[in-house]
Curated annotation (Swiss-Prot):
Domain of life: Bacteria
Pfam families hit by this protein: SHMT (PF00464)
Chain positions with N6-(pyridoxal phosphate)lysine modification: K229
Species of the source: Coxiella burnetii (strain CbuG_Q212) (Coxiella burnetii (strain Q212))
Gene transcribed to yield this protein: glyA
PANTHER family linked to this entry: SERINE HYDROXYMETHYLTRANSFERASE (PTHR11680:SF50)
InterPro entries: PyrdxlP-dep_Trfase, PyrdxlP-dep_Trfase_major, PyrdxlP-dep_Trfase_small, Ser_HO-MeTrfase, Ser_HO-MeTrfase-like, Ser_HO-MeTrfase_PLP_BS, SHMT-like_dom
Name of the featured protein: Serine hydroxymethyltransferase
Length: 419
């Protein structure tokens, strides 16, 4: 049924209700999931624009459909801005997600059965870094390095595994590591075995763009990322690379027609405006505050006798190990959720429980920083988290924290300009 004047509210009240309730949840819950953020009204607007109607297989100036002259402008803006923002020589803005960006980069760099050396999932890696349940572990032979006893990446182990297995690709990147990656050291390990060096900066892309976290873009052969998380754009992917005409051609072919058809032009336009937002001076201030808030929270939890993997944080997240607390990550996540504090359970080094239960929590500060929280609020929030974890079955404590969290959220609305 096509009726231009009929709203979702009047046509599909069930769906409208779910969206309304999710809007309310985002306003009244404290978001501490490290991979989540709040996009700007501009990003929201573009994702609902008429660009969603246009098929545009191919690349700007080389399309398989007519009528692409205006979406070409949008995509070229996204490409040019991505290259400028990250100091890249090449950018492909068509990947639908970070996972797809990884799959496409692998396709350009490896053949099925080749060896991939990446971080172990239980030490902070990602499913697409060679987990046996992922395409990356099914199509390629995955070998994994982890963290050392000090909670840092075990570069010596990575170098030893590289010499032993001679991987085609060495990947540096993470989903739950709170330190700074030594990109150059990985470059040297890759060069020692004539491997491609690939980086996945999905979690820290916004920090890299702002210049508050080291950039691997001109060190690695290929860099992938999501465009949400710390970058605060739409949920999608991006591939970057330093100059290499042959590799650029293979990357383009891996994206289209290798694994995707028509690009999502409304999402690409949203990427373009998000990249422009990230170029503003205010974005660097935002990224710096993310780091300050994460450090403030981690310090409070350490003072309250909680174990922080790697001993602290140098980015936007930190991992709390509950191995010595007789609390599972699942229990902790649920208890905090009842207090309107959203976190995610996470595996930790030395994990003894299943990935569905876990012994840890991952905590991140991009979303609360977007709301306007600073160190004062971040520290206060960390104390509330500890209050609940200290007495996890005490519903009175949970109810008290829920009220405090509700009041705090009321002082820092997410989308006040849309009300």
């Amino acid at each position: 049924m096509y009726e231009p004047t009929l709203t979702v509210e009047s046509f599909d009240s069930e769906l409208a209700g779910a969206i309304r309730d999710e809007r309310r949840r985002q306003e009244h819950h404290v978001e501490l999931i490290a991979s989540e953020n709040y996009v700007s009204p501009r990003v929201l607007e573009l994702q609902g624009s008429v660009l969603t109607n246009k098929y545009a297989e191919g690349y700007p100036g080389r399309r398989y459909y007519a009528g692409c002259e205006f979406v070409d402008i949008a995509e070229q803006l996204a490409i040019d801005r991505a290259k400028e923002l990250f100091g890249a020589d090449y950018a492909n803005v068509q990947p639908h997600s970070g996972s797809q960006a990884n799959a496409e980069a692998y396709m350009a760099l490896m053949n099925p059965g080749d060896t991939l050396l990446a971080m172990d999932l239980s030490h902070g890696g990602h499913l697409t870094h060679g987990s046996p349940v992922s395409f990356s572990g099914k199509f390629y032979k995955a070998v994994h390095y982890g963290l050392n006893a000090h909670g840092d990446i075990d570069y010596e182990q990575a170098a030893q595994l590289a010499q032993e297995h001679k991987p085609k690709v060495i990947l540096a990147g993470f989903s739950a590591f709170s330190g700074i990656v030594d990109w150059q050291r990985f470059r040297e390990i890759a060069d020692s075995v004539n491997a491609y060096f690939m980086t996945d900066i999905a979690h820290v892309a916004g920090l890299v763009a702002a210049g508050v976290y080291p950039s691997p873009v001109q060190i690695a052969d290929v860099t992938t990322t999501t465009t949400h998380k710390t970058l605060r754009g739409p949920r999608a992917g991006l591939i970057l690379a330093k100059a290499n005409p042959e590799l650029e051609k293979r990357l383009n072919s891996a994206v289209f027609p290798g694994s995707q058809g028509g690009p999502l032009m409304h999402i690409i336009a949203a990427k373009a405006v998000a990249f422009k937002e990230a170029m503003q001076p205010e974005f660097k201030t935002y990224a710096q505050q993310i780091l300050k808030n994460a450090k403030a929270m981690a310090e409070v939890m350490k003072e309250r006798d909680y174990t922080i993997v790697s001993g602290g944080t140098q980015n936007h997240l930190f991992l709390v190990s509950l191995l010595n607390k007789n609390i599972s990550g699942k229990e902790a996540e649920a208890a905090l959720g009842r207090a309107n504090i959203t976190v995610n359970k996470n595996t930790v080094p030395g994990e003894t429980r299943s990935p569905f239960v876990t012994s840890g929590l991952r905590i991140g500060t991009p979303a609360i920083t977007t709301r306007g929280f600073k160190e004062k609020e971040a520290s206060q929030l960390a104390h509330w988290v500890c209050d609940i974890l200290d007495d996890i079955h005490n519903e009175k404590v949970i109810a008290d924290v829920k009220q405090k969290a509700h009041e705090l959220c009321g002082k820092f609305p997410v989308y006040q300009e849309l009300d």
